[in-house]
Curated annotation (Swiss-Prot):
Record keyword Kinase present: no
Positions bound to acetyl-CoA: A390, N396, Y397, S415, G433, R450
Enzyme nomenclature, EC number: 2.7.7.23, 2.3.1.157
Cofactor: Mg(2+)
Localization terms from the record: Cytoplasm
Protein name: Bifunctional protein GlmU
Gene name linked to the record: glmU
UniProt catalytic activity: alpha-D-glucosamine 1-phosphate + acetyl-CoA = N-acetyl-alpha-D-glucosamine 1-phosphate + CoA + H(+); N-acetyl-alpha-D-glucosamine 1-phosphate + UTP + H(+) = UDP-N-acetyl-alpha-D-glucosamine + diphosphate
NCBIfam families with a match to the protein in the record: glmU
Region (Linker): 232-252
């Protein structure tokens, strides 16, 4: 089986330089949603028909999921763009004669693989199967014209008679059929219609004339066949998607303070008794352990947060690729925020405290370590029970290379210190507040590295 995705349209009503199919829904391009769904159908190949912004569209989806899913992603271009039938004609040289073809639209992102499997089953090996739906207001859609219960044709809005425009069953833009018949029917298309285009929907009348059964698989879920032609439609579909995700999470036992104020732009996996406050955004792959609490207005990307951890409001967690060394890990019982920032490579152990306006990047903090206020830890290895003072930073970059700072167990760093890497502070050592430390320090020592305090009596400030 081959899957053909039409993605050539300009999307004039989007009023954007970005090709329509590359606008984002739930953090992924519209077209990527469709490609990812096609990946679940055991297809031999996916053929994407591009046109407007072809190079940009092709670059955006090339290499995504195809090889790992066991099929190829190929591109053909529709230039000029002379209608949906003309678009699919461009894919003909890549289609096998002995297989089935599923035709999808790149701007209909929420079609589900299960629905497509039902459509494919309805087509069997010898039928033309159309995915249809009833709309109270069918304006703009091709109408399904029947004689009795038998589908006879699809009539586009501009070509429909007043009687046909009263029909509420419409074509979704999705079909499944044998490749051999598709090729034959595409060769018979003409432009004798109100728009002067080659309509893919005209193949229905050819199927009827040739005695090929035409079946309509009707669904009720309008979000699955909703297209995106404007920012208004995109926003509406985004809300529909997020509402569905929120419902699924709540059915799994997640406590959402307000399901209407949640955004999941990837995969969110939650254990038992997780609670999420309002206006939180989850991107990439995020895993929340049992009893995790997420405060309001947090943004969390590619992170694993262990049981009992609390992420206070306005915390940003910015992990790298899932499964890589740059993914963020937060240990059990950790307390993060408010207003904390965990960047790629932050690995926090059990009961670690990261407080307000603390930034951690590419650093490992062992059990019980604390940095509670106004601090930076970059490229650092922090031992158990370390206390890192307010206003302190690791100076990890020399202008060309990054260097590591090691704080061994039970170290105490006073406020407003600068630790210039590479540097090791020995176990149990203390660094006095305001110190700039450039050399390794021995275990258990107090290190003070600051200018001597001088008070000048009767000092008079300059005046104009």
């Amino acid at each position: 089986m081959d899957v053909v995705i039409m993605a050539a349209g300009k999307g004039t009503r989007m009023k954007s330089k970005l090709p329509k199919v590359l606008h984002l829904l739930a953090g992924r391009a519209l077209l990527q949603h469709v490609v990812d769904t096609a990946a679940q159908l055991s297809a031999r190949q996916v053929v994407v028909i591009t046109g407007h912004g072809a190079m940009e569209v092709e670059a955006a989806v090339s290499g995504n999921t195809g090889a790992s899913a066991g099929f190829d992603i190929n591109f053909v271009r529709q230039e000029p763009q002379l209608g949906t039938g003309h678009a699919v004609q461009q894919a003909v040289p890549l289609l096998r004669d002995d297989g089935m073809v599923v035709v999808l639209s790149g701007d209909v992102p929420l079609i589900q693989a299960a629905t497509l499997r039902h459509l494919i089953a309805a087509a069997g090996t010898d039928k033309l199967a159309l995915l249809t739906i009833d709309f109270a207001d069918p304006t703009g859609y091709g109408r399904i014209v029947r004689r009795g219960d038998v589908v006879q044709a699809i009539v586009e809005q501009k070509d429909a008679t007043p009687v046909q425009r009263e029909i509420t069953e419409v074509y979704s833009g999705i079909m499944a059929l044998p490749a051999r018949q598709l090729k034959a029917w595409l060769a018979r298309l003409d432009k004798q219609n109100a728009q002067g285009e080659y309509y893919l929907t005209d193949i229905v009348k050819f199927a009827v004339a040739d005695g090929v059964p035409v079946v309509a698989h009707k669904i009720a879920d309008a979000t699955q066949v909703a297209g995106v032609n404007s920012p208004v439609q995109l926003a509406a579909l985004e809300r529909a998607f997020q509402s569905k995700v929120a419902l699924q999470l709540m059915e799994q036992g997640v406590r959402l303070a307000d399901p209407a104020r949640l955004d999941v732009r990837g995969q969110l996996h939650c254990a038992q008794d997780v609670s999420i406050d309002v206006n939180c955004v989850f991107e990439g792959v995020v895993t929340l352990g049992e009893g995790v609490k997420i405060g309001a207005n947090c943004v969390i990307r590619n992170a694993t947060i262990a049981a009992g951890a609390v992420i206070h409001p306005f915390t940003h967690i910015e992990g790298g690729q899932p499964g890589s060394k740059d993914a963020v890990e937060v240990g059990a019982g950790a307390l993060i925020g408010p207003f904390a920032r965990l960047r790629p490579g932050a690995k926090l152990g059990q009961a670690v405290h990261i407080g307000n306006f603390v930034e951690v990047k590419n650093s490992t903090l062992a059990r019980g370590a604390k940095a509670n206020h106004l601090a930076y830890l970059g490229d650092a290895t922090v031992g158990e029970r370390v206390n890192y003072g307010a206003g302190s930073i690791t100076a990890n970059y020399d202008g060309a290379f990054k260097h590591r700072t090691v704080l061994e167990a039970d170290v105490h760093i006073g406020s407003n210190c600068v630790l210039i890497a590479p540097l090791t502070i020995g176990a149990g050592g203390t660094v006095g507040g305001g110190s700039t430390v450039t050399k390794d320090t021995p275990p258990g020592a107090l290190t003070v590295a600051r200018a001597k305090q001088v008070s000048i009596a009767n000092w008079k400030r300059p005046s104009k």
